[in-house]
Every structure is written in C-alpha cells, then in structure tokens.
UniProtKB/Swiss-Prot annotation:
InterPro entries xrefs: Ribosomal_L11_MeTrfase_PrmA (IPR050078), Ribosomal_PrmA_MeTrfase (IPR004498), SAM-dependent_MTases_sf (IPR029063)
Catalytic activity, EC: 2.1.1.-
GO molecular function: protein-lysine N-methyltransferase activity
Gene3D superfamilies (UniProt xref): Vaccinia Virus protein VP39 (3.40.50.150)
Keywords: Cytoplasm, Methyltransferase, S-adenosyl-L-methionine, Transferase
A biological process from GO: methylation
Pfam families: PrmA
Binding locations of S-adenosyl-L-methionine: 145, 166, 188, 230
Main location: cytoplasm
Name of the protein described by the UniProt record: Ribosomal protein L11 methyltransferase
Family to which the UniProt record says this protein belongs: Belongs to the methyltransferase superfamily. PrmA family.
Entry function: Methylates ribosomal protein L11.
Catalytic reaction(s) noted: L-lysyl-[protein] + 3 S-adenosyl-L-methionine = N(6),N(6),N(6)-trimethyl-L-lysyl-[protein] + 3 S-adenosyl-L-homocysteine + 3 H(+)
Organism phylogeny: Bacteria, Pseudomonadati, Pseudomonadota, Gammaproteobacteria, Enterobacterales
Amino acid sequence: MPWIQLKLNTTGANAEDLSDALMEAGAVSITFQDTHDTPVFEPLPGETRLWGDTDVIGLFDAETDMNDVVAILENHPLLGAGFAHKIEQLEDKDWEREWMDNFHPMRFGERLWICPSWRDVPDENAVNVMLDPGLAFGTGTHPTTSLCLQWLDSLDLTGKTVIDFGCGSGILAIAALKLGAAKAIGIDIDPQAIQASRNNAERNGVSDRLELYLPKDQPEEMKADVVVANILAGPLRELAPLISVLPVSGGLLGLSGILASQAESVCEAYADSFALDPVVEKEEWCRITGRKN
C-alpha cells in the first residue's frame, strides 16, 4: 500500500527527540538521513552517531490525517507553530523486486564477472561468480569490493590458498576459487555472513574448497598465500598484528574498506611487515596491497 512521509530538518543533538515525537504522532517507522550526504563511519560500540545537520523522516499509513499529525508536532518545544516540514506521498513498490531488477552482471578486470543468480551470464567462457548476497554485505557494486575483485583477477591464484578476512557474502573467497585458488578460508563475525557465504559457495560449486569460521572457531595456525580484508580502516589498524601473520613469507596482502584520507594511517600499521605497493584509489575509496617480508 502507499505511504506518506513527513520530513523534518534538525541538528544531530535533537534528532532522537524528534524521532520520539514522530512516533508518538503515529509514525510507523523513522529514518535518519544526512542533509548534506556526509558519510559517518565506525561509531563506538553502543553509539548512535548522527550528522550535525540531520533529516528525520517519519513514515505514516496512507490513511493518516496529516493535519492532525502537524497539529500534534506544533506542540513540541523543539518545533512550535508553523515549523518547517515537507510531506510527500510515496508510491507503493516491491522494493526487493526493484533492487533485483537493478542488479546486473558486472565485469572486474580481464576474466571475472559477478552475476546475480537470477540473471543469465553474459559470457559463458568467462570466470562467472553467481551471487545472491542475502543478508550479508558484498555484491561488487561498492568501490571497495570492486577494487578487491580487480586485484584478485590480476593475480595468478592457481593452486593457492586464500583467506577472505571479513567475508560478508563470500564474494571475494568464491571469486578466488573460481579464478583458480585451491582453497579459500572465509572469516566473519556475523553468523548471517557465514550462512550467505555457504549458500553462495554451493551455488557456485566450490563449497568443498571453502572453509568458513567465526573468529572464535578459526584454527590457531592459519596461513595463506593471499590474504584479502575488505572491512574498515579502524578494524584494519586494530587487527594489523593478527592480519599481518596470516600471509606466508612472500605472500600477498590486499586491504580495502578504506577512505583515501585514511590510507596513510593504515599503511603505517602494516609497513613493518610488508613491502607495500602504491595505493590505488577509486572514487573516495582506496586499496592497499603488499608482499610479506
């Protein structure tokens, strides 16, 4: 069914109070959006970090009398009579179907294609990874995933062991296996990611060569010829002592999930253990690669 949304602009400090006010006025859900499209990364545990200039959006049933909603909100001390707002009627959509319709096969490097599992492959002779991300991150559409896939495609992975640290949907580990790796190991803190990776591995016929672990279950002595970690700059810095010991001597490391402005600090965390290559950038993101000393 169609919906009505009411949008308010406020400061991050007042956003939670206005969220409560919208719920009390009958909103069925609340969304926070940055007015200026400024990214927020890596909040502290338990922290809900909001932008300095925040849009608070309440979603209402189409039958709601919005004049009554506005009258209720005018009594709020942060708003008052005649407060600025915007009301829009939203078209009813099958959002899952719309997302699926807009997810098309994508090529990375010379050989590799990532294809939605519900679409035909564009090149039968290419290295095709059939993907259904489910509830986990990783479709290839994000610049960081794209950077990692292009890097993997550029390598000779024949017979190699690959670790995908923070595997999400399993896209990188599965791509490595399809590109010739003998074995891949996926590690993620999210059980849903482990399940999504397992499902995608089965879909691609590589489940017998993919090991999946939550961090608490991973073997103590794990080594690989290639290690790729597409997470975020903060965890990459904090986990550098752990990640740095995973590649064998002479092994390769690929890191992403890093803003270009964060590259220097991440490089510093790995410089003692790796001979690092020049940083590669895509949009505002980057990839760091190197060889183990």
